[in-house]
Structures are given as C-alpha cells and as structure tokens.
Amino acid sequence: MRTFLFLFVVLFFLTPAKNAFFDDKCDKLRGTCKNSCEKNEELTSFCQKSLKCCRTIQTCGNTTD
C-alpha cells in the first residue's frame, strides 16, 4: 500500500512533458510559432493562441568583395 501511495504522489506531481516539435512548428514545418518575429524573419501566417508563424528569411548568397 505504501508503494502505491508513493507512486501516486510522485506521478501526480510530475509535470507533463512538452513536445516542442509538434507544438511550435507551422508553415509545413518550416516556421515557428512566436509572440513576435525577429529582424531576419517574416510573418507567414498565424498560429493558435494568437501567435505568429515566423519563417527565417534566407539570403541569396551573392556577395561582392
């Protein structure tokens, strides 16, 4: 009985694990859901809970020296 009570208390107070891969991805897994986008990101759509789907802007790679 003590074992059951101990396991119940331990499992009851554990916080559930958050799977960030499925919760925070948007735009066909190319963007992330955030409160606001960074300078190098563009707003592509909206996520749940009034979050914004931000996708990183890739540079063209052309540099002049």
Curated annotation (Swiss-Prot):
UniProt signal peptide: 1-20
Cystine pairings recorded for this chain: 26-53, 33-47, 37-54
One Pfam family cited in the UniProt record for this chain: Defensin_beta_2
Protein localization: Secreted; Membrane
Keywords: Antibiotic, Antimicrobial, Defensin, Disulfide bond, Membrane, Secreted, Signal
Source organism superkingdom: Eukaryota
GO BP annotations listed: defense response to bacterium; innate immune response
Chain's role: Has antibacterial activity. Acts as a ligand for C-C chemokine receptor CCR2.
Subunit comment: Monomer. Interacts with CCR2 (via extracellular N-terminal region); this interaction may preferentially require specific tyrosine sulfation on CCR2.
Similarity comment: family membership: Belongs to the beta-defensin family.
Protein name: Beta-defensin 106A
